[in-house]
Amino acid sequence: MGRCTALHEEHLALGARMTEFSGWELPLHYGSQIAEHHAVRRAAGMFDVSHLGVVDVEGLQAAPFLRRVLANDVARLAEPGRMLYGCMLNQDGGIVDDLVVGFIDDRRFRLILNAGTREKDLSWLHRQAAPFSVTVTPRDDLAMIALQGPDSPRIADAVVAAGSSGLKPFTATQRGDRFIARTGYTGEDGFEIILPHAEAGSLWRQLFQAGARPCGLGARDTLRLEAGMRLYGQDMDETVTPLACGLGWTVAWEPEERDFIGRAALERERIGGSPSKFVGLILEEPGILRSGQKVAVANVGEGVVTSGGFSPTLRRSIGLARVPAATGRECRVEIRGSLKRATVVKPRFVRRSTSLIDIC
């Protein structure tokens, strides 16, 4: 059995089917993964995401430190409350982790790390922090709840904090003990609330009473897949650069003198051109796309499905894949020994309950 979050008893009381994920005991679903998925697309759902790593970086050199360790640039955060998404890279440009950073004040930032890389990330951050006047503090005293879906602003105003709906996307505010961010991992509008363990159960029950449906990891994965959001360990890892997984937009190349870790390797890749590109796939024959399946592109080469599954919104099998740069609009995917036709599209399928399918 993995570690339990502060909401473990709440999940059991609601009849959750539990599973282990990245060393944590978390809900897979509460009876119907499909119904939970649709609840987020059509109304509101809530997730226990307390397994994510919350880390505070503080000190006189907090900003210079993060400008060194992140490919994106926290100097872009013009005022407290702004947030950005980016990657920490190794010297070869490979992704150590993808994360969200919040600017609290000139001496304090908050990082949200992936659960599976938490200990590795902390070790790496501590090593990189040695030349800087900063502290890196994991906040193991905090829980985290994601409220997602078109009804989430109404529920947040009523339950989380009055005026929550006034937050702009990728901004955050501190209301008492609650750190409230207009962020998420579903492709829908929503909030992520970080708060003390002792308060988590009460907020969870209030959200439930206000109409938010409890959702598990299963729905979280199909929602993020439809939205084209990457999953660390599947869509990228330390052997994959941001340019090779469609995250080149998270790299801040200016100013040129900012020497972030991995910059030299990325510069070489940018000049020479990446041999691969990151795409979406729609399966045109019976079957289900799954991570690890081979992608065959006639007269070009081979690629690999990095994430795949059934889309409850589109009612089709979709996937994300890394394929040769010269790949056109069609390919075939090897499923149980047979090559199945697939259409190549841009790597996002659904946002705000709307189909975004766009042929490459």
UniProtKB/Swiss-Prot annotation:
One of its GO terms (biological process) is glycine decarboxylation via glycine cleavage system. It is an enzyme of class 2 (transferase). Its EC number is 2.1.2.10. Gene3D superfamilies: Aminomethyltransferase beta-barrel domains (3.30.70.1400), Aminomethyltransferase fragment (4.10.1250.10), Probable tRNA modification gtpase trme, domain 1 (3.30.1360.120). Keywords: Aminotransferase, Transferase. InterPro entries: GCS_T (IPR006223), GCS_T_bac (IPR022903), GCST_C (IPR013977), GCV_T_N (IPR006222), GcvT/YgfZ/DmdA (IPR028896), GcvT/YgfZ_C (IPR029043), TrmE/GcvT_dom1 (IPR027266). One of its GO terms (cellular component) is glycine cleavage complex. It catalyses: N(6)-[(R)-S(8)-aminomethyldihydrolipoyl]-L-lysyl-[protein] + (6S)-5,6,7,8-tetrahydrofolate = N(6)-[(R)-dihydrolipoyl]-L-lysyl-[protein] + (6R)-5,10-methylene-5,6,7,8-tetrahydrofolate + NH4(+). One of its GO terms (molecular function) is transaminase activity. NCBIfam families: gcvT, PRK00389.1. The glycine cleavage system is composed of four proteins: P, T, L and H. Belongs to the GcvT family. The glycine cleavage system catalyzes the degradation of glycine. This is Aminomethyltransferase. It comes from Methylococcus capsulatus (strain ATCC 33009 / NCIMB 11132 / Bath).
